[in-house]
């Protein structure tokens, strides 16, 4: 028996925040105002933590110059164990497109930036554009990565039954191994576009089927940066209701 054989479903929520190098300043400002700051502050106040978060290098640089108080909040949450920061290539490269040495170097740049700014030794990786190839495992391990988030479609395309993906996996290349977590496609498309009760029903169903781990990770920009989502998530009350439902699932022993 392992830790996933009994008890509530472990739901892991992951967020990816990115603005490309050279993007207009007003785009950074609008996303900070409409997405990054309101989501994190309301999630903190509403008890949605802990979360995992990836900040891209260009966004981290801009925030350091223009919104240090926001980074201070991230640092406080990380120090308290309420926010786990994820690695990636610093400038958001698609890792399989780079030579091996450049892959490792880009990740090490991000690792050092997170250590220097927040005092954390990040070991998980957000896979840019979720593009994977098996040879990445050895390079990620060499960069100090212990686990990576990967779309469940990669598993399905390799012949894994979808119902087997609600558990941690390990992969290996060059004699080096790496933990792999499958991002559930259904949850990724449901949150935040479906009513929270629909997501709750999905989570209850997963637990009833005997699953003990579900990973939902995607762009944070869909919580206020995509067209129509600001009103839906904040003004209409999706986020407040989602946090209420999430709390209820916890009280039921479901999640």
Regions found by a protein language model. Name each.
Residues 224-231:
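Active-site His/acidic residue clusters
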Residues 1-123, 130-189, 196-211, 233-252:
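Catalytic alpha-helical scaffold of carbohydrate-active enzymes acting on polysaccharides/glycoconjugates
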């Amino acid at each position: 028996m392992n830790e996933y054989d009994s008890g509530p479903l472990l739901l892991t929520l992951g967020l990816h925040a990115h603005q490309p190098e050279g993007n207009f300043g007003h785009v950074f400002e609008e996303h900070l105002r409409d997405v990054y700051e309101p989501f994190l502050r309301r999630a903190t106040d509403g008890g949605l933590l802990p979360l995992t978060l990836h900040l891209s290098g260009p966004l981290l640089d801009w925030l350091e110059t223009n919104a240090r108080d926001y980074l201070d909040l991230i640092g406080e949450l990380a120090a308290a164990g309420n926010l786990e920061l994820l690695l990636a290539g610093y400038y958001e490269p698609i890792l399989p497109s780079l030579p091996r040495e450049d892959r490792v170097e880009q990740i090490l740049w991000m690792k050092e930036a997170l250590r220097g700014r927040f005092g954390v030794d990040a070991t998980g990786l957000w896979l840019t554009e979720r593009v994977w190839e098996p040879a990445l495992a050895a390079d990620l391990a060499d960069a100090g990565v212990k686990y990576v988030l990967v779309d469940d479609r990669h598993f399905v395309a390799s012949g894994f039954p979808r119902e087997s993906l609600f558990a941690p996996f390990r992969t290996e290349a060059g004699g080096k191994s790496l933990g792999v977590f499958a991002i559930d496609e259904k949850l990724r498309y449901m949150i935040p576009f479906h009513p929270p009760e629909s997501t709750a029903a999905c989570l209850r169903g997963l637990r009833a089927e005997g699953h003990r781990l579900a990973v939902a990770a995607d762009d944070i920009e869909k919580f206020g940066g995509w067209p129509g989502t600001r009103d839906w998530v904040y003004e209409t009350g999706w986020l407040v209701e989602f946090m209420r439902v999430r709390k209820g699932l916890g009280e039921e022993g479901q999640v």
